[in-house]
């Protein structure tokens, strides 16, 4: 049993990129689906597909690599808030990731949002992870 599904999600992507895989399968949940949509909109992954099965479903993510250097598009996936130590931020406390080059994913009262979306809507929430 996985005690931290978000950390598992990030670790599966990180390990697949380190191994040079093109596609990674991740057990689905609504939170992971929304995080995947954010990764796609921010340009960190090529495409994704949700597949239903008898259990919870699977998210298939096509990873993105630089065509010239073969380096992954995602340089770092960093879990911030964790089950043992939750990290919350007010709208004014949401900091930029890598001076605006990265993205923070937050779980807010208005759903799962990026740091820029949360600031624009003036909502704070739990800082799930930093991606750059």
Set out the residue ranges of the language-model regions:
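Core subunits and conserved enzymes of cellular information-processing
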Residues: 1-132
């Amino acid at each position: 049993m996985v005690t931290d599904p978000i950390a598992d999600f990030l670790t599966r992507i990180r390990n697949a990129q380190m191994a040079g895989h093109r596609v990674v399968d991740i057990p689905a949940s609504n939170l992971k689906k929304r995080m995947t949509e954010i990764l796609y909109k921010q340009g960190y992954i090529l495409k994704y597909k949700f597949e239903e099965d008898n259990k919870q479903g699977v998210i298939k993510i096509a990873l993105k690599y630089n065509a010239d250097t073969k380096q992954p598009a995602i340089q770092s996936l960093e879990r911030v808030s964790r089950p043992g130590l939750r990290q919350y931020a007010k709208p004014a406390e949401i900091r930029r990731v890598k001076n605006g080059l990265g993205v923070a994913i937050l779980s807010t009262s208005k759903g799962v949002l990026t740091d820029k979306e949360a600031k624009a809507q003036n909502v704070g929430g739990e800082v799930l992870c930093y991606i750059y």
